[in-house]
Amino acid sequence: MLYDTSSLMKCQVKKYSGLNFARKIRPVAPDISSKIWYCGTSIGLTYDGLIASANFCKNRFCPTCQWRRSVKLFKQNYDCFEWIKAQYPGCRFVFLTLTVRNVPIDSLASRLSDMSNAWHRFTMRRDFKHLGLLGWLRVLEVTRNAITGTYHPHFHVVFVVPSGCWLPDHSWWLRCWQLAARDESIMFVNLRVVDGSKSSIEEVSKYVVKDSDFSGSAWVPEFTQLYSALSNVRCFSPAGCWRAARRALGFVDPDKDTLTDDVSTGG
């Protein structure tokens, strides 16, 4: 019997990106560079191509581990969508992107802390609670503008809306986020209904940083500050029925995941 090696081939592609990334950061972060360099050097496959064992480094900046997290999060989020729809017939899913102004690397850590506090104020508002939402999934993403060299942290959120529930319009969400963030200069939030399709699930299955944002080398002197800013930051936060779905389905926190496949269930 021949092995299905498609997963191994995809890991190999990401491994090349990881080696390039490790070379770049070696002068400023040799320990992290070493972990990423040796990540995924030993991978065990089942006959049907599932990754049964591997020495993944699990670092947030490792291209291989980023890819594995995204693959697993996509499947888990799809299963959560299906579980929630079965438990709450007629519910809707609303996708919201909450942005803040770009900041230089020196201000990123404080901006992330401010965003966490703003989110707490946002969800504690009396008018927000009156919406009667069933739960949500909030994901943090941080991108880098290659032209300005600034960083753009933002939240992707999927809200689960009960059947027949009225939701306010775009201007209400923008105003509430401005007040929660205590920043009147915020001029944009993105609000739309999603259906659990592949494209909508992919949007909330990203991980905190993308290796494509680090194709050049201008960011290298900033890496230690970036790494420190994202340390101990909660990037994946389910609540309500979404947390219940993950618990019922036996999913673990993405940062604690081994990044191998669950060979007992075939995925």
Name the predicted role of every residue range:
Residues 1-151, 161-267:
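Right-hand nucleic-acid polymerase module
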Residues 157:
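Cys/His-coordinated zinc-finger cores
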